[in-house]
């Protein structure tokens, strides 16, 4: 019985727009959300005093925070549509890192992007 509240997909099960996404984008997505367009985020670390981690506004397949989703998705910032999330993430990555490969290299070093 699956007790995970978020549906997750393997890389082969994803519906990919326009024939595919870069492998670095897929790698980041799988590390961030397991491919779930409805995934929320809970910080694993607490304050060190037994207090659990805090929720963040990160959401979706690429775990973009709310302010970033609003910037790149506008009124659709809460959309669970993969194509919209991927498009927004691609614009964010291009603006911040220049490419998905550069974003992946940053993620490997910092465990976020």
Q: How would you label these PLM feature ranges?
A:
Residues 20-113:
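Peptidoglycan cell-wall recognition and remodeling modules
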Residues 1-20:
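N-terminal secretory leader/proregion of peptide precursors and effectors
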């Amino acid at each position: 019985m699956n007790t995970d509240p978020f549906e997750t997909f393997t890389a082969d099960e994803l519906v990919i727009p326009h024939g595919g996404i870069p492998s670095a984008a897929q790698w980041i997505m799988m590390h961030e959300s397991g491919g779930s367009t409805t995934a929320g985020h809970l910080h694993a670390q607490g304050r060190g005093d037994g207090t659990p981690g805090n929720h963040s506004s990160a959401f979706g397949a690429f775990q973009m925070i709310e302010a970033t989703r609003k910037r790149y998705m506008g009124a659709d910032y809460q959309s669970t549509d993969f194509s919209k999330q991927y498009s927004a993430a691609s614009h964010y990555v291009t603006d911040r890192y220049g490419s998905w490969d550069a974003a992946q290299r940053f993620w490997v070093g910092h465990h976020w992007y």
